[in-house]
């Protein structure tokens, strides 16, 4: 059971790793525009422009959610985390509004965040992933939701 996310800070960069976003024209080449790294970025900036805490902050909520589900499982049995996971999946599948700039109130209630105000609630799209980058428009959201 982790309280703090695993450290995924890169100390070295290789050109053959992280092929998660490949070009549709040439599968062996990475698609630099869809990686949302700002286009053609030198490898040195991938290493030097990242702070060691950035990866921890990106994975913070996921790790806390996993820890919470593990504690629910230990206290209430397997039914409680299964129920909460299914409720979250239902909300993620049904609450789809690509024109909405803020999050879903249903998701906030399930995550127990309905009374908290985060930076992203006041200034949407200014978090770790800005909404002004390539591939984050209405059409891309609809394509991603429908699996196109």
UniProtKB/Swiss-Prot annotation:
Keywords: Chaperone. It comes from the Eukaryota. Seems to be degraded by the proteasome upon its formation. Pfam families: UMP1. The keyword DNA-binding does not apply. Residues 8-26 have a biased composition (Polar residues). GO terms for cellular component: cytoplasm; nucleus. Belongs to the POMP/UMP1 family. Short-lived chaperone present in the precursor form of the 20S proteasome and absent in the mature complex. Required for the correct assembly and enzymatic activation of the proteasome. Also prevents premature processing of the PRE2 propeptide. This is Proteasome maturation factor UMP1. The gene is UMP1.
